[in-house]
Structures are given as C-alpha cells and as structure tokens.
C-alpha cells in the first residue's frame, strides 16, 4: 500500500460495527479498519487523537499477543497499524457517509488521528487463481456463546437450562430490537452433530438478524434488512448460489432444486466449520466434549429425543472448538465475576497507581497473557486472583462476540485445502475476526443486563416448554445428506 498515493476512489464502503468502519480496496484483497468516535467528539483535540492511536495499537496487540495464541495462528489475522493522510480520511468519510445505515450514524469516522488498521479482505480468496469465472462466496457467522454456564454462583435455575442467546431473544423482541424470535441456538451449532448444526444454520438463514451475512466477490448479497420487519430474501440468495451447485438444477429425491441448493450450501458450511481436526491412531478426529456443561438448550427447537449424548463433539482443531475453549475461560459466570470486580475496585480506591501493574487498560502483551493462563482455580482472597479471573472473563467475552468467516470458491483438482464433497469441490479458508478487548468498566453493565435478561425471560415464558413457541413454524422438511 503506497500511503503517499492514497486515493479515496480506490476504496469502497464495506461495512461497520459499533467501534469502526471498514472500507475495502477495489483491486487488492485489503481492507482498512477506521475507528469511529461519538459525533460530539468530532472536533477532536490532540489528546483525543493520541487516545485513538493508543486504542488501535491496543486492538492489534490484543489480537496478536492474546487471541492469536489462544485461537490459533491460522485463524487470526492481527493486521498492521498504518499512518494515513488526513485529507484521504476526510474524503473517505464524506464518500461512505451516504452508504452508512442510519442507526450507525450516531458516531462518525475518526479523521484526526491519521491511523488505521490494514487487514486482509477475508471475503476474498487471495490464492484463488480465478481460473473459474465464479467469484468466492463468503459466509460471516457470529456464533455467540456455545455452552450453558455451570457456575455455582448462579442464582436462577433457568441459566442452567436455557442459553444466553435464546433468553436474550425475548428481551430484544420486547425492546423492539427485532420483530421476530430467532430459532437459532448456538448450542446446536457448537454440538458437533451434523444434524443439529444443519438446523442451526437453516434457522440463521431464515432469521439472520446480525448473526449472519453472505458475500459474493466481496459484495454483500444476504443479511438482515435495515427494516427488521422484512423477511430475508432466500429466493434471491438461491439465484446467487445456483451456479455453484449446477448438479442441483433438476429435482433431487423429489425435492425442489431451490431447497436442494440451500441444503448443499449448508453442508459446505458445516464441513468447513468441522474441518481441521487432528487424527489419532485410528484415523478419527479427536473430539472435544463438554464435561461440566449440559449439552442441550431447552429453548432449542431441535427435538431432544434425537440427541444422542456422547456420540458427537467438535474436532479439537476445528474453528468452533478453538472458540469454545476460549469462551469457557468464563467458568464463574457474571454473577461470580461481579464480586471479584468489586474486590479489584476496592483495592484500586486504596492503591490507584496499581491500575498500571494490574494491566487493566493494557498493555496487552505476554505479561497480560501469563495472567490469563496462570490464574488459580481456587479463590485465595487476593486481588491477584480477582484480576486474573476478571481478565479471563474479558477474554472469554471477546470469544463470545467474535465472528467466523468461511470463504470458498470452486477449485481445480490439484488445489489443496479443499472440502471433499462428492460434487462440487471447493477451496476454502476459515478465519476469526471481531476480536477486540472487552472493557473492564463494562462489567457492572453486564451484571445488570444479565439480571434484566433472565428476569424478563422468566416473566415472558411462564413455564411452558420453550419449543412450543415455534409450533407455527415447524412445518418445514429437513434434509440430511452425507457429507
């Protein structure tokens, strides 16, 4: 990237989250992540610009020194901090403004710090030689927390039975965040059972909310509409996917080709999510099983009588297993973490300079990582134990809010890293992104939010089996084919 020749016309709006705007290069497989600031701070003092630079350096350090060792080198791309001309940033801000969702416009692009994070464009396959005319398809999934908490500190029985995502759906519906309940359950996706994973992905396609996006050649082709009242257009998605599954254009086992295409598409995603497992002597992938946590959420629409405990698990080197292992660093739940947070706060009131030694605001380096890895299992009453558990919780929260990118394209026979489906065959890559640190100061908010979510769920469900909520949408036929 030639920083002295930056031209806003070489870049296009790619998307944004709460903290940053992403723009992608028109010709190269690169994106720039540019931080956002509240509109009222857009005047930007010199101090604010320095804080922004420190923030973006923290993002890169946290990804490089904490999340990459935990999740695996092959899955995490930390990027590099780049200095950018201020005029380029100002012009870029004007260019993307008209494409930004209205609900995101409470913040503006930072145009004063002169820095950004350069990363590979994970919606593309840089090693794909484009011998095939079909551009890469990229599926972005935000899987959320894949286990039921098992902490003795929990005060409500429902938290042992119903996952956080499914409970949160009721709260978001009541607050107008979404117009319909999602039937997606993270525990189904993380189960390792191809049947349960199929159901989870099918439910994401039916109600993507902000947990599923699909790109084609780097262009967004499927996501939740800005108007949440609109249903996602599956027919349009099928038309985009049809060239990738040409053998499904006729009736297949009596089913319409559109349904068969979606079935094949889901199976490709499942195969990528389960790939990468190590093999033991028998040649079977080593599996990861949850020993302490209940493996099934009672709010999941998947029939409980079809679950065979002990027969499934995630290959230990698969992307979902890696994410789940990091999520499970939270073994106390927020109800166990909050008292430890208060212990740290009380200590800091007496010794405010200790905030630096405890690395509450970073730096996110090997020392921080050592604290996360070496925390004691038993509480000895010390502030060291408390901050160790708080840091573990923050890292686990990052993993609970990360995204998985699966990018695939039709491959040539001699290409490696391919999904071995009977037909067609795809070359693919799997990556993890959205790996920012979760703020220490956010713990009181998480504690209050947890209580609101649980209490609202208990009031709204009033004890009938949660699966009865979905009776009106259970007429679909599920297809399970060998992969």
From Swiss-Prot:
Q: Does the keyword Nucleotide-binding apply?
A: yes
What is the protein name given in its UniProt record?
Inositol-pentakisphosphate 2-kinase
Cellular component per GO?
A: centrosome; ciliary basal body; cytoplasm; extracellular region; nucleus
Give the taxonomic lineage as stored in the record. Answer: Eukaryota, Metazoa, Chordata, Craniata, Vertebrata
Q: What is said about the domains?
A: The EXKPK motif is conserved in inositol-pentakisphosphate 2-kinases of both family 1 and 2.
Which GO BP terms, alphabetically? determination of left/right symmetry; epithelial cilium movement involved in determination of left/right asymmetry; inositol phosphate biosynthetic process; melanosome transport
Q: Corresponding gene?
A: ippk
- Organism annotation: Danio rerio
| Start-end of Basic and acidic residues biased regions | 281-297
Q: Where is this motif: EXKPK motif?
A: 140-144
Q: What molecular functions are annotated in GO for this chain?
A: ATP binding; inositol-1,3,4,5,6-pentakisphosphate 2-kinase activity
Tissues showing expression? Expressed both maternally and zygotically. Expressed in cleavage-stage embryos. Ubiquitously distributed throughout blastula stages of embryogenesis. At the onset of gastrulation, it is enriched in cells around the blastoderm margin. At shield stage, expression is detected in the deep involuted cells that contribute to mesendoderm. During mid and late gastrula stages, it is strongly expressed in axial mesendoderm. However, it is not present in the nascent tailbud at yolk plug closure (YPC) stage. Expression in axial mesendoderm is reduced at the 2 somite stage (SS).
Task: Give the start-end ranges of region Disordered.
Answer: 279-298
